[in-house]
UniProtKB/Swiss-Prot annotation:
GO terms for cellular component: cytoplasm; ribonucleoprotein complex; ribosome. GO terms for molecular function: structural constituent of ribosome. Belongs to the bacterial ribosomal protein bL33 family. GO terms for biological process: translation. It comes from Mesoplasma florum (strain ATCC 33453 / NBRC 100688 / NCTC 11704 / L1). This is Large ribosomal subunit protein bL33A. Keywords: Ribonucleoprotein, Ribosomal protein. The gene is rpmG1. The keyword Ribonucleoprotein applies.
Length: 54
């Protein structure tokens, strides 16, 4: 019998230029809200807020 996955792959999008720079694995069980992280965007060439897409 196959168990359900406890993690899923998400993509982070830059708020300024809307480029999809990062992909992460997120736990379905512990984190219910959308992820927001300040990371470096290579297109903007600065640190910007990146949000999770669905």
């Amino acid at each position: 019998m196959h168990k359900t996955k406890s993690t899923r792959k998400i993509i982070l999008v830059c708020e300024d230029c809307l480029s999809r720079n990062y992909s992460l694995n997120k736990s379905n069980l512990t984190q219910k809200e959308r992820l927001e992280i300040k990371k470096f965007c290579s297109m903007c060439n600065k640190h910007t807020l990146h949000k999770e897409t669905r």
